[in-house]
Amino acid sequence: MEFSLLLLLAFLAGLLLLLFRGHPKAHGRLPPGPPPLPVLGNLLQMDRKGLLRSFLRLREKYGDVFTVYLGSRPVVVLCGTDAIREALVDQAEAFSGRGKIAVVDPIFQGYGVFFANGEHWRALRRFSLATMRDFGMGKRSVEERIQEEARCLVEELRKSKGALLDNTLLFHSVTSNIICSIVFGKRFDYKDPVFLRLLDLFFQSFSLISSFSSQVFELFPGFLKHFPGTHRQIYRNLQEINTFIGQTVEKHRATLDPSNPRDFIDVYLLRMEKDKSDPSSEFHHRNLILTVLTLFFAGTETTSTTLRYGFLLMLKYPHVTERVQKEIEQVIGSHRPPALDDRAKMPYTDAVIHEIQRLGDLVPFGAPHMVTKDTQFRGYVIPKNTEVFPVLSSALHDPRYFETPNTFNPGHFLDADGALKRNEGFMPFSLGKRICLGEGIARTELFLFFTTILQNFSIASPVPPEDIDLTPRESGVGNVPPSYQIRFLAR
């Protein structure tokens, strides 16, 4: 939908609703921000290039903590490393609530481990962390699963014989198979039609959720939901994925062996059975479906997109690629696969992966938080249930913590001796009590897939390095890298 039409619809909505609701009311003692219009909120301050651009521009005038009105609802925006850490770490409990993402709210409605709140969320998060940890130990470790998948990926890339290809589908396949092995107890063949359909739905949905239309929908969901738009396609896509998950759950239920749980779904079904007499239990069918959807979506999209962006950066900066491959040769060699223990001996490669995550800036303004009580913060009072947007991008590009914030520079994560150093501005997985629960798995995947590929292949592009464009194809809730062609040449 064109911006002008969206603006017209929003303006008409404002005129109609103004007759019934009047001006936005004052809320506590919120941080300063641009004065909102009735119902329209700060629509006129929103940049056509999206919410991130809008927030960064408003930051220049109002500072690191300010309030914007998305429609009639106030949202507190946090910018910069220090403000985000003060909120999510120093006052972790107060800022531990989860806000809504309007385009997916009709699906989740506050259920599942990502969108749940209060004790429901705590119980689901504890369970999810413990279950993934248990399936990362015992039987087959997560590391072994990733190494197996990396071997399959190398075999598939060898089949290309150095021809140009788009790595999107392959990277989606390998990262998805890791979470599939933990959640569903199986991996899929890369040509499996059901698997390919699921991957297409995830890729479509991530791109649509990150689109400009979805950002406009965030301002006026109650009104725009009555019109055609990306929100309807997102709903259909996620419903189709949920149908697949539901069918898989029923197959698990029919073959469940209580003495030998095979995967996350089995363990959850056993917990459901244990709690079936408790009507207040969080462990019910709907939370199972939506928690699996969350794990599947996050476990597929975020890591695969980081890998895609990473190899685009390696094409643009071939001298970095050469240095990574030299470190791989020195530490690992060519006769065994990379292992997680190698990471501690490979500070340059680890720094490169950190810098890929930093500059890739996958989730620019993070997932929405919500304060769980009236909260004093930097001299203001944020009322209970107010949404909070931590702009992670502003930390990942914070000039106080990164010397060249807009340039690819692995030195941001290396000390004078070449050892890996911690950087307070690095928060791609967010911080605090809502930090990504798959952080450990994602970091392991990034290291093992990245090093295995560069151990076995040189890479080349039909485009000269200086002409490679890093501009995201979509930039909203997520940054979607541009499509590109790459050759994987066996070493």
Curated annotation (Swiss-Prot):
Transmembrane segments: none annotated. It comes from the Eukaryota. Heme binds at C436. Its main location: endoplasmic reticulum. Induction: By phenobarbital. Its cofactor is heme. Keywords: Endoplasmic reticulum, Heme, Iron, Membrane, Metal-binding, Microsome, Monooxygenase, Oxidoreductase, Phosphoprotein. It catalyses: an organic molecule + reduced [NADPH--hemoprotein reductase] + O2 = an alcohol + oxidized [NADPH--hemoprotein reductase] + H2O + H(+). One of its GO terms (cellular component) is endoplasmic reticulum membrane. It holds the Pfam family p450. The keyword 4Fe-4S does not apply. It is found in: Endoplasmic reticulum membrane; Microsome membrane. GO terms for biological process: epoxygenase P450 pathway; xenobiotic metabolic process. It is a peripheral membrane protein. Its EC number is 1.14.14.1. GO terms for molecular function: arachidonate epoxygenase activity; heme binding; iron ion binding; oxidoreductase activity, acting on paired donors, with incorporation or reduction of molecular oxygen, reduced flavin or flavoprotein as one donor, and incorporation of one atom of oxygen. The modification Phosphoserine is found at S128. The keyword Calcium does not apply. Belongs to the cytochrome P450 family. Cytochromes P450 are a group of heme-thiolate monooxygenases. In liver microsomes, this enzyme is involved in an NADPH-dependent electron transport pathway. It oxidizes a variety of structurally unrelated compounds, including steroids, fatty acids, and xenobiotics. This is Cytochrome P450 2B5. It comes from Oryctolagus cuniculus (Rabbit).
